[in-house]
Amino acid sequence: VSRDGWDAGTRWSVFDAGPHGIGHQHNDKLHISIFAHGRDLLTDAGKFTYRGINDRSPRDWRGYFKRSWSHNVILVNHKSQNDEINVATEPLTDWKITDLYDFALGTFDKGWDEHEGRHQRAFFNIKDKFWLICDRMELQESSNIQALWHFHPECTVSKTQDEHVFTTDIGKGNIRIAPVIMDSSGWTVGVVKGQTDPYYQGWYSAKTNRKEPNPCAVYEAADVKTAQFAWLITTDKGEPPVYKAEIVYSEGENLKVRIVDNQ
């Protein structure tokens, strides 16, 4: 958990980078939730139900809510993360908490169904300013990937021509997600809500056996084998600030992002 403070209007976020666990777990490694300016903005979808015919399918309610399709993670060829059965034997070491920023690094390497690979995600919370999320994908074979961002049902979500997605609720806390990609020509983004065909997407459950539609931004890129990209996330009560961000260096596991305040 990363937070800027303890008052009612503070920003706080959750980065799920720990071991998967041995029971009651969801396939949500590297998921991020964000609360800011008095309300939930990016969310975990909840659990909805313990009943299902095939909990490995996004056409099954149990499968959708339990597995990666309902979390803020990356899919490979629309497939969920595989199970990662393990127990922590030592503390996580790749994290740092300071007065100016919080940092954590997590890795998922158990594959997505039959697709082998590795997703590494670095989480930075520059306190009272923005979040920078850096992703590195290393896949066994070229695949389509889908980066998901689920919003709380009360959020009204729009997108811009340069593929930013943002909420537009007057007088409330709002959020903007800006992709930081060296070559964005191969990416598309759509916002879905309450989808049932060809599979479930854009559903949220605050309580068991209750569900409702919620917006989900789906960023998709084709023919990805090894790639690095980032997300700049800002919040504010009203209109979130806009920063200019660009990748200035990407080599191996190294990624350098330049961020400039447009205001």
Model-predicted regions and their roles:
Residues 1-41, 99, 222-228, 248-262:
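Carbohydrate-active enzyme catalytic cores, enriched for enzymes
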Residues 53-263:
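CBM-like, beta-strand-rich accessory domains located in the C-terminal region of large
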Residues 42-47:
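Catalytic Cys-His active-site segments of thiol-dependent hydrolases/isopeptidases
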